[in-house]
UniProtKB/Swiss-Prot annotation:
Residues 1-27 are annotated as: Disordered. The gene is metXS. Substrate binds at R247, D380. The keyword Iron does not apply. The record marks R348 as: Important for acyl-CoA specificity. It catalyses: L-homoserine + succinyl-CoA = O-succinyl-L-homoserine + CoA. Its EC number is 2.3.1.46. NCBIfam families: homoserO_Ac_trn, PRK00175.1. Residues 71-386 form the AB hydrolase-1 domain. The lineage of its organism: Bacteria, Pseudomonadati, Pseudomonadota, Betaproteobacteria, Burkholderiales. This is Homoserine O-succinyltransferase.
Length: 415
């Protein structure tokens, strides 16, 4: 392993420059994209002791895999995202990839250089096998019988996608939030298959407060009369109310107090005459209207059982549990170089949690670059376009490309 290296960057411009970049010049998109569905018939053993005998994963790819298969980047998604990382979904021009500002030609993860893979995690509800899928043993939706999953289970399933493409080692595995946990797990469980690990706005384990938020959200779903013990599919209903409340709770944790104050403050939605309160329990403030809208929208496209499953996977993630709480020991198997990025107003996974990872890596002598970005947008900052944040990621991937002997010009010449 190379000698220890730390590049620390705490980027703190004035507040009026921290909004997402809205410049007129933008790199190109990867264009219109469609997923492929990969079926795996080899049983997948799970951390719970159960196994899945067969399953499908929805996958999108961008860019070109080189002859050496050395330029592949895996993007891992967070709770409610999917394989659709970049570009515009075929047949739905409004469906733009959740990280389209990060992945594409000339973007920080440059698809003129790298072959990028997005995978919808096992148990999710966007095409991969999950609770809403048919259980082959019963001919009915899995529902509550779908096995509980962990981040490590996802990594093992993702590794089979890499095998499908003949990729022995990723140039980088990258993710934000829960996606960052998956990237970290890759570096620990399959160290020989990860050259660089990019962990953004993440944590090595959830705090009691975060587990508490997840539990309140789950109880909102489970106690909804439409939940039916997780077998609501058979009743032709959905626990909309519980899922909407769960999303409202989660959404608050994704925003910072500063961001909410700027967006909503105490502005009333439709004040009575002369700005008086309406003295009732319907929507009074703009923030209430916004949260109700977000909750209702979410409940129309996301599966409630998937929400339970993924939040529990979040709770269970704790790689240092096996080493008596010693994170450095848990990370001692890692062979990758690391980039960690945190955001000052992220109170869901605050910068101190990223620093915990950095300190553990330095203790092991692992090369690590760390950037702490001063941004007002809270946890969601990792999804937004910010010139300083993107510059950090761009510079890191340019370094990866140089180390691999890849440049945009070289790729174009090879083509």
């Amino acid at each position: 392993m190379t000698s220890p290296a730390l590049t620390a960057a705490s980027v703190t411009p004035s507040r009026n420059t921290t909004s997402p970049d809205t410049t007129s010049h933008r790199p190109a998109s990867v264009g219109v994209v469609s997923p492929v569905f990969l079926r795996f018939d080899e049983p997948l053993p799970l951390a719970s002791g159960q196994s899945l005998n067969a399953y499908e994963l929805a996958v999108e790819t961008y860019g070109t895999l080189n002859a050496e298969r050395s330029n592949a980047v895996l993007i891992c998604h967070a709770l409610n995202a999917s394989h659709h990382v970049a570009g515009v979904a075929a047949g739905n021009p409004k469906d733009v990839g959740w990280w389209d500002n990060m992945v594409g030609p000339g973007k920080p993860v440059d698809t003129d250089v790298f072959f990028v893979i997005g995978i919808n995690n096992l148990g999710s509800c966007f095409g991969s096998t999950g609770p809403a899928s048919t259980n082959p043993e019963t001919g009915l939706p899995w529902g509550a019988a779908f096995p509980v999953l962990t981040v490590e289970d996802w990594v093992r399933a993702q590794a089979r996608v890499a095998d499908h493409f003949g990729i022995q080692r990723f140039a980088a595995v990258m993710g934000g939030s829960l996606g960052g946990m998956q990237a970290l797990s890759w570096a620990i469980t399959l160290p020989e298959r990860v050259a660089h690990c990019v962990v953004i706005a993440s944590t090595p384990r959830l705090s009691a407060q975060n587990i508490g938020f997840n539990e309140v959200a789950r109880r909102a779903i489970i106690t909804d009369p439409g939940f039916h013990g997780g077998n609501y599919y058979a009743h032709d209903t959905v626990p909309h109310r519980g899922l909407a409340v769960a999303r409202m709770i989660g959404h608050i944790t994704y925003l910072s107090d500063d961001d909410m104050a700027e967006k909503f403050g105490r502005t009333q939605r439709e004040p009575a005459e002369n700005g008086a309160y309406r003295y009732g329990y319907d929507v009074e403030f703009e923030v209430e209207s916004y949260l109700r809208y977000q909750g209702e929208k979410f409940s129309r496209y996301f599966d409630a059982n998937t929400y339970l499953l993924i939040t529990r996977a979040l709770d269970y993630f704790d790689p240092a549990r096996a080493t008596g709480g010693d994170l450095a020991r848990a990370l001692s198997s890692a062979q990758a170089d690391f980039l960690l990025v945190s955001f000052t107003t992220d109170w869901r996974f605050p910068p101190e949690r990223s620093r915990d990872i950095v300190r553990a890596l330095l203790k092991n002598g692992s090369p690590v670059t760390y950037a702490e970005i001063d941004a007002p947008h809270g946890h969601d900052a990792f999804l937004l376009e910010d010139a300083r944040y993107h510059a950090v990621v761009s510079a890191y991937y340019e370094r990866i490309a140089r180390n691999l002997g890849l440049t945009r010009q070289a790729e174009e010449s090879a083509a």
